[in-house]
Amino acid sequence: MDSKQSSELVFTVRRQEPELIAPAKPTPRETKFLSDIDDQEGLRFQIPVINFYRKDSSMGGKDPVEVIKKAIAETLVFYYPFAGRLREGNDRKLMVDCTGEGVMFVEANADVTLEEFGDELQPPFPCLEELLYDVPGSAGVLHCPLLLIQVTRLRCGGFIFALRLNHTMSDAPGLVQFMTAVGEMARGATAPSTLPVWCRELLNARNPPQVTCTHHEYEEVPDTKGTLIPLDDMVHRSFFFGPTEVSALRRFVPPHLHNCSTFEVLTAALWRCRTISIKPDPEEEVRVLCIVNARSRFNPQLPSGYYGNAFAFPVAVTTAEKLCKNPLGYALELVKKTKSDVTEEYMKSVADLMVIKGRPHFTVVRTYLVSDVTRAGFGEVDFGWGKAVYGGPAKGGVGAIPGVASFYIPFRNKKGENGIVVPICLPGFAMEKFVKELDSMLKGDAQLDNKKYAFITPAL
């Protein structure tokens, strides 16, 4: 279940000077506005992704750096907004100045083999800051490259493709669509199989805007007791949930909820264990935000090539005492209801709220955010060397407020079991408690009753 894969592996990465890759052909010079779903405070950050690839003798010694560089330039002809820069207009409205300047690219070599990373590639990755170099001056939201890509050759002939995205531009499906296009061009295509669609106006606020749904996810919650996660002493660990672990969690599911999804039961369990580990006061509100892809919730559905942000943050809210003292079914009911809240009207209401309330950040105080990327397809991206050994988020806890978010990433362990790996980021004291609580549940010896969690007292 628990992976202690660490950053003990040390190696040297030698980088070339960063360069800008511009579109291979002239592209329109224009201004394109982001949608009111893209343009929210909680997405104004850079999100890191990493893919590992084995050597493939059928590639005949081709250089992955040169192949991918050329493919990026060709792909940017179609995705030319990525080659531009963001700027703000009236009321902080974000827009892309399509300048054609290009995306940031770093070529590198590492004196390490893929095998040395171990037989279970998963976050946290050693020397991540060397595999995805933070080029000075590149990490801002405005007037900076919208993508930073580093390709690192490995001693064994494999390579690592790492990417950092300005999240206001795309969500996971949109980013994978772009990466897939780069892979197709790298393999000789003349155009992506799915052509990009901008159409960000589809997710703009109405005129006049009117908030028609309840949005607890954007409530302003004062951090009266200093319960925002401290940024020092943060520990990163990953946890694997295969058939055995999921079955163990399902033993706590009441009969009327037996049709719940793996996402739902896993989210309920992790939210509960995490809340116990950080020890909020019993009367304080705690939240779990579930990222829900809303593409299929529209009628008609959003165009298949749409690569903007098209998700919502529906939230379940309760008190720490209720969450921790009730059986798992209590949290599970809350999570199930939360996911069903997202409709076309809900998305329109969020867009309207952004305009009315000044594009607020989602609530982070005593909040846990989960994002399921098991079907996103990061690992399917093929530049000619086959599918990735690992493909997905580079670490947990990313975001404007570190430590809040976890990703559910598809994973096969060394036993050959398919499952989900979840990177968790917590302060050291909380991580120890989290591991004990989760281990207790998985061993089936957790007594989910009122006595078990009596440690939560007003004195804390």
Curated annotation (Swiss-Prot):
Biological or metabolic pathway of the protein: Aromatic compound metabolism; benzoyl-CoA degradation
Active site annotation, chain numbering: H167 (proton acceptor), D382 (proton acceptor)
Pfam families xref list: Transferase (PF02458)
EC number per UniProt: 2.3.1.196, 2.3.1.-, 2.3.1.224
Top-level taxonomic group: Eukaryota
Tissue-specificity statement: Specifically expressed in flowers, mainly in the limb of flowers corollas, and, at low levels, in roots, stems, sepals and leaves.
This protein's UniProt keywords: Acyltransferase, Transferase
InterPro entries (alphabetical): CAT-like_dom_sf, Plant_acyltransferase
Disruption phenotype: Decreased endogenous pool of benzoic acid (BA)/benzylbenzoate and lower methylbenzoate emission, but increased emission of benzyl alcohol and benzylaldehyde. Increase in the flux from cinnamic acid (CA) to coumaric acid and to flavonoids. Delayed flowering time, large flowers and anthers, delayed anthesis, as well as large and dark seeds accumulating abnormal high levels of flavonoids and anthocyanins. Greater internode length and stem diameter associated with an increased lignin accumulation. Fewer first-order lateral branches but longer primary roots.
Annotated function: Involved in the production of volatile organic compounds (VOCs), including floral volatile benzenoids and phenylpropanoids (FVBP), in flowers of fragrant cultivars (e.g. cv. Mitchell and cv. V26), scent attracting pollinators (e.g. the night-active hawkmoth pollinator Manduca sexta). Acyltransferase that catalyzes the transfer of benzoyl and acetyl moieties to a large variety of potential substrate alcohols, and involved in the formation of volatile esters benzyl benzoate and phenylethyl benzoate from benzoyl-CoA.
PANTHER family: ACYL TRANSFERASE 4, OS05G0315700 PROTEIN
Similarity-based family: Belongs to the plant acyltransferase family.
Protein name from the UniProt record: Benzyl alcohol O-benzoyltransferase
Source organism of this protein record: Petunia hybrida (Petunia)
